[in-house]
Amino acid sequence: MPVVEIYTKTFCSFCWRAKALLESKGVAFQEISVDFGGAEKQRMVERAGGRTTVPRIFIDDTHVGGCDDLMKLEYDGQLDAMIGLTT
């Protein structure tokens, strides 16, 4: 299974939506809180090409974007292959 990482903040509704989609598909993911900034937030910004908003979602170290990007992948039928649910 691919490694899925999602950078989040506690009171972010977009983060909740992205996590809910992944959970509905039974996908295990590592959630990394950036509520308080610091090293984790800096790492997220560096990995995401300077983007500072959350969520920031990575699948196997590839930045796929935020919540809207994840939803578009789902709508376009591409997400399942990326997260290892199809061959």
Task: Enumerate the language-model features and the residues they cover.
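Acidic-residue sensor for enzyme active/binding pockets
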Residues: E5, E31, E40, E74
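Local sequence-structure signature of Cys/Sec-based thiol-disulfide redox active-site neighborhoods
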Residues: M1-Q30
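Thioredoxin-like thiol-disulfide oxidoreductase module
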Residues: V34-T52, Q78, M82-L85
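Compositionally biased, disordered extreme N-termini, encompassing classical targeting presequences
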Residues: M1-V3, G84-T87
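Structural micro-motif
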Residues: G49-F58, D68
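Anionic group-transfer/hydrolysis microenvironments
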Residues: Y7, D35, T62
